[in-house]
Amino acid sequence: MQVDSAFSIDYDFVKELKTRTGGKKMSETGLTTLSYVNTVIRERPREIHKGQCGRVLIVAGSVGMAGACVLSTGAALRCGAGLVKAAVPEEIFPILQIAVPQATCTNVSDREFLRSVSVHDAIGIGPGMGVSEKKYKLIEEILSLFDGPVVIDADGITNLCRFGKKTEILKGRENVVLTPHPGECDRLLD
């Protein structure tokens, strides 16, 4: 089945891949190898400053779902981003700042952070952010202000499916990556 909208996925290929790999991890299939990863992720030179390694904004987390934000913020740092800012509810600042002290926090409820989205090199949206029309409107606003690379995951995808016209707001953008789990993928393709 071919789906044409803001993205294109050959769902039959995904099913075929699962069948052929027998559910093995990608690293066990030879599709992703350590030698390939080493060509993509390189050791950072010692003399480089963190400000030269990219700025990432993570819009994630909510009361009761701080862990999702901790994991995604930490992942951005481990993947090499020099400066990572998390836009989260103020109530979870202490959790994030203890778990990922290298990251900075901004209050997602104070729309002030939207003025500076363009200074980032990439944005991650969704993990644990919660699902509501207000969250969908926030995603819409971020996408209207930022034309760089965006990764939308978890609750971000659910918000697109529930309150938007799925991927309609992504049309014309080539730099958006959706990372659905099987249930989210079903909602996107439904």
For each feature predicted by the language model, list its residue ranges.
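Glycine-rich phosphate/dinucleotide-binding loop and adjoining beta-alpha-beta core of small-molecule
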Residues: 1-34, 85-190
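Long, highly charged low-complexity segments
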Residues: 27-52, 114
